[in-house]
């Protein structure tokens, strides 16, 4: 991955790489024969200008980066970050990028299969120090779904393997209710949205039955698309993803 911002905004977001560094890296990637790679753009820095953000995106596009991930810095100015994200949606779409997730943009044929698997709530096995794993049995849902993380220290990790003892730092079992909430949080970030039938089948949560009034209000405000089987955020709703998700999860009660 290549990460960067406009030269004039590097200090504003704490980025140590220059545009020249990024260009050299991309040339090396091309010479090595890679056609699938991703670049990162950082936004939300306290001193980052709108012009700088535009230049940062334009630079990545001009270098031919096929997949972009936007990283948000929470500096307290939510309005500024929303404005930058709104600009990115418009700008990158016009350049042929599809916003398949809130902060992941790809040209046709260049979506990250790993990211799509994550946002589909698929099982993941993480290997190495500090790696995180999520493992859920096949349908129907089971309380045996687990999430765990390995110890971050390399020495402790190796010693655990040598002693035939799993070097796990944290391990938790997830209830069906907790899984339903996670699935909602993940899917509401995606362009495809939250499949209400899948939510009911996988996690026994019938959201439309429980939150019909809330969904109706969100639809009237232009924050979600009208679809009897799916909740997908509009571009306006995407700028309020966290607030909409918190509202729906809060109204569901504790996990």
Please report, for each region that a protein language model flagged, where it lies by residue.
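Extended hydrophobic-aromatic, low-complexity segments
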Residues: 196-197, 209-210, 226
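Short, amphipathic alpha-helical interaction segments positioned at domain boundaries
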Residues: 236-255
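Short amphipathic alpha-helical interaction segments
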Residues: 205-220
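C-terminal scaffold of the Radical SAM
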Residues: 1-205, 253-254
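A short, conserved structural fragment
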Residues: 219-229
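Structural preference for long, well-ordered alpha-helical segments in enzyme cores
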Residues: 181-184, 214, 244
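Minor-groove-contacting beta-hairpin "wing" of winged helix-turn-helix DNA-binding domains
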Residues: 230-235
